[in-house]
Amino acid sequence: MLDPKRVRTQTEEIARRLAIKNFEFDIATFEQLEERRRAIQVRTENLQSEQNKRSKSIGKAKAAGEDIKPLLEEVESLKQQRGDAEDELRSVQESLNAFFAGIPNLPDDDVPPGASEDDNVETRVWGTPREFDFEPKDHVALGEQLKGLDFEKATQLAHSRFAVMRGQLARLHRALAQFMLDQHTLQHGYTEAYVPYLVNANTLFGTGQLPKFEEDLFRTAGDNPLYLIPTAEVPATNLVADTILDDAELPLRLVCHTPCFRSEAGSYGRDVRGMIRQHQFDKVELVHIVRPDESTQALEELTGHAEKILQLLELPYRVVTLCGGDMGFSAAKTYDLEVWLPGQGKYREISSCSNTRDFQARRMQARWRNPDTGKPEPVHTLNGSGLAVGRAMIAVMENYQQADGSILVPEVLKPYMGGVERIQ
């Protein structure tokens, strides 16, 4: 959530910057709500002041032997008017809160302009795509040949956009997740966390999925529904919700391996083949909680940690800086890592790394005590995939495939595969 004080004092500038994210800030509605809030607040304060004066007059009148009944009636009337004004003020404040809840984060100054993914900017490229002396297959064909991927059975069990993995491909999937966790905890200094896969609405509000993106979520039935997490970013970042951290606790780096669940409501007809876009998929998620002056550098570090996984797997990839129109709701700046998939002949997203600055922290009341001022201030939060496990498996399958349809196991994964060097 944006700082309301800043929105009030820099309204035109806020609207200009939000336009970079293709968001139209409704200045007229905001100013109308603000004008009502201020007017009602002044009226409430005046009524309170008048009530206090009348209450003091009662004591004086009583001591003087005067009839206090008229004063009591006045105080009661003022009390009723003040109560009505406070109710009206709460109603307007709720409208303002709902208005603010729907406003996305401001983009950083160096975010490139643009309307869609076509306007994203390639930042760097690592590795060279392999030249095959045969026509490379995609992961679907490879998985079917190896009898390790079964989409038909998954559809029978659940619905489309699910997968069943068996044998050495299931093991490869597990090995990738374990390798990622070990790299991040042992080499990059993250603390591993196990988190709930179901969370409440307040938790999803904190990270920005609710109220705007409810259609993308799976929820339980009943009066107090829970939601399946779309990413471990949600519970992991909220571990510091409603908390004032000591300076010594920062920076905090967390890593989680969880399944993720998304309805893909806006993805009809996109990536219907294979595992690229699933309702259920595994992801190793990285979360940073840092001091405000550290978040710019923290984004570079977090992105580098995700890149290291791809480098160790020797998978060609590129880093793109998302333009304003392609950025997520909570993000101030985002890098996407896109891995080369020979079966598709193009780069595909495998990680998205974002700095949300104090946007999520304000929504979830996550603060730290600034040692210079002694006062609580919002922390900055960052998140990124390190990596999406299923897409990493796809990349390994397609980049390490052989002419006979077998798949060589990357060197760094062999210890996790029990010595298996080739999946066939």
Swiss-Prot record:
GO biological process: selenocysteine biosynthetic process; seryl-tRNA aminoacylation
Subunit-level organization: Homodimer. The tRNA molecule binds across the dimer.
Origin superkingdom: Bacteria
Pfam families: Seryl_tRNA_N (PF02403), tRNA-synt_2b (PF00587)
PROSITE patterns for this protein: AA_TRNA_LIGASE_II (PS50862)
Top-level class of the enzyme under EC nomenclature: ligase
Single GO term (MF): serine-tRNA ligase activity
Entry similarity comment: Belongs to the class-II aminoacyl-tRNA synthetase family. Type-1 seryl-tRNA synthetase subfamily.
GO cellular component, one term: cytoplasm
Entries under InterPro entries matching the protein: aa-tRNA-synt_IIb (IPR002314), aa-tRNA-synth_II (IPR006195), aa-tRNA-synth_II/BPL/LPL (IPR045864), Ser-tRNA-ligase_type_1 (IPR002317), Ser-tRNA-synth_1_N (IPR015866), SerRS_1_N_sf (IPR042103), SerRS_core (IPR033729), tRNA-bd_arm (IPR010978)
Binding locations of ATP: R262, S263, E264, E349, I350, S351, S352
Listed Gene3D superfamilies: Bira Bifunctional Protein, Domain 2, Serine-tRNA synthetase, tRNA binding domain
Residues that coordinate or bind L-serine: T231, A232, E233, E285, S385
Gene symbol of the encoding locus: serS
Role of this protein: Catalyzes the attachment of serine to tRNA(Ser). Is also able to aminoacylate tRNA(Sec) with serine, to form the misacylated tRNA L-seryl-tRNA(Sec), which will be further converted into selenocysteinyl-tRNA(Sec).
Catalysed reactions, semicolon-separated: tRNA(Ser) + L-serine + ATP = L-seryl-tRNA(Ser) + AMP + diphosphate + H(+); tRNA(Sec) + L-serine + ATP = L-seryl-tRNA(Sec) + AMP + diphosphate + H(+)
Protein name: Serine--tRNA ligase
Organism of origin: Marinobacter nauticus (strain ATCC 700491 / DSM 11845 / VT8)
Keyword Aminoacyl-tRNA synthetase recorded: yes
Pathway: Aminoacyl-tRNA biosynthesis; selenocysteinyl-tRNA(Sec) biosynthesis; L-seryl-tRNA(Sec) from L-serine and tRNA(Sec): step 1/1
Record's keyword terms, sorted: Aminoacyl-tRNA synthetase, ATP-binding, Cytoplasm, Ligase, Nucleotide-binding, Protein biosynthesis
EC number: 6.1.1.11
Localization: Cytoplasm
Primary location group: cytoplasm
Domain notes: Consists of two distinct domains, a catalytic core and a N-terminal extension that is involved in tRNA binding.
